[in-house]
Amino acid sequence: MSYLNPQAIVSTEWLSRNINDPNLVVLDGTYHLPTANRNSSEEFPLKHIEGAVFFDIDDIADADNVLPHMLPSDEVFSEKVGALGINNEKRVVVYDVYGMQSAARTWWMFRFFGHENVAVLDGGLPKWVKEGNKISSSPITPSPTTFVCNRQSLLVKNLNDITEIVKSGKGQILDARSLGRFNGTEPELSLIHI
């Protein structure tokens, strides 16, 4: 299979070959929906890819916004990812416990803040484990570094942008939720859609 942006996805085989690269940071970007009654920050220390650090979307967000997981300021993102040992030269690979669900959001956040050298692990932790690769419960203490944001504002649309897209028909809006969440037959924080 070919991809429009093949650098955006790496295979488990690639990660297995490159796991010890000092220029690589592996991130667990797992986020569970509130209805799952699970806590990814509590689960991470029990089982993660060896050498991975945890990207906490609850912490790396705009704390002043009433909506969850809104993008943080450049300063907050820089501080938090720098504390994870990520600078602008590092290659970042993101995975999650579902395969590719929440890892894609973490990937997009890095792209939004100007980090292009980021990829999602195809198949995530389930595929990694199924293939017999190393997992760990050992804590990792990353060496803090400096990450400089280069915000890519075109990757976010506001209400006026969305309204114009709907009116003009010059774009397509996709709702990434499951059909049940979209239709309101499964629990959802917001029972609306465009």
Regions found by a protein language model. Name each.
Residues M1-I192:
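Cytosolic catalytic domains that perform sulfur/thiol-centered chemistry
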